[in-house]
Amino acid sequence: MADLFSGLVGGVVGAVAAADLPAEGERAPRPAPGTAWTCCCSKLQEGARELEGFVQQLSFVAGKLACCLRVGAEQLARCAAEGRLPSSSSSSSCCALLQLEKQDLEQSLEAGKQGAECLLRSSKLALEALLEGARVAATRGLLLVESSKDTVLRSIPHTQEKLAQAYSSFLRGYQGAAAGRSLGYGAPAAAYGQQQQPSSYGAPPASSQQPSGFFW
């Protein structure tokens, strides 16, 4: 298993080392077509500028609205203090105020129109940038899969060799262990068989059991 693991790690390290990296002071290699993020980044920058314009127009409209509300509140307070109702033809100051309000209204409407256009352009650019980013990411993913496939195919013979070596070493160890167990079991069996031989405990030797010639 150690040989197999070292072989796999060696294949990964070799694949990483085989990557083309620019040397110091050397230009980086030009990316493959369809894998650059330049177009996506430019669209995002344009969308950010349009969104900034929308915020500016919105701030202008909010300022004009706040100014109109402040002027209207001051006029109502002055009319209430004088004890009369506000009318558009009471004095020349009221006419000037109405003209100013009309001008502010026109400016606010124009600013709102420009802000809406900026928001639409910003949304469109953001959507285009998103689609472009998805396309670039998909292209890069396909190229990465292709390069990984080539690396894996190149490392298959080396991995097969390591697997064969690991299997052969395991098989040799297993056979050696099996042979050792068989030898260990046979020796005690032979000794046990020798101990089972009939003994002549308490019996005279075979020569002493022959009839003696004293009685003949």
UniProtKB/Swiss-Prot annotation:
Top-level lineage group: Eukaryota
Disordered: annotated segments: 194-216
Protein name as it appears in the record: Sporozoite antigen
